[in-house]
């Protein structure tokens, strides 16, 4: 008798066919990778196919693969990753679609399929700059209105570009260039034989 994960894998391959870029199993979960051009249609199939029935989107996030594998990775930089649940069949799936353009990452919005994707996609847009085409209200959700850049990108400086402070003369919050100097954080190594200045 086939296990649940084997059954799901067979159902996915049968329903999606050539649209599957890769389908891998790790830690008891399947990860399905599809092209950005197929992302929306695949999501509809995952929800509507009677042998799949992924009724619920649990989570959606962006990922920046710029330094993945110690920089050895040379594939697309940004991906949208969705975690889906089939309440009917009691199985889960991770769906990943890589944006083909690193300079302007665009993937389709899943809001029309799972309304719970709304704020998740806004968050991924705000933090990674991934544009979700067809989203009804794609604007920042976590950072300030005038924020420049996308803070979860690997090339975004830890200290940021601007800082805000209250100006008592203007009686309002103002933005100014960051006054913190960027620095390399190196962990402190404690040698046991000289710990605390004591010689053992």
From Swiss-Prot:
UniProt family annotation: Belongs to the complex I 30 kDa subunit family.
GO molecular function, one term: quinone binding
UniProt-listed InterPro entries: NADH_DH_suC, NADH_quin_OxRdtase_su_C/D-like, NADH_UbQ_OxRdtase_30kDa_su, NADH_UbQ_OxRdtase_CS
Cellular component annotations (GO), alphabetically ordered: plasma membrane
Record's protein name: NADH-quinone oxidoreductase subunit C
SUBUNIT field: NDH-1 is composed of 14 different subunits. Subunits NuoB, C, D, E, F, and G constitute the peripheral sector of the complex.
Reactions mediated catalytically: a quinone + NADH + 5 H(+)(in) = a quinol + NAD(+) + 4 H(+)(out)
Organism encoding this protein: Burkholderia cenocepacia (strain HI2424)
Subcellular location: Cell inner membrane
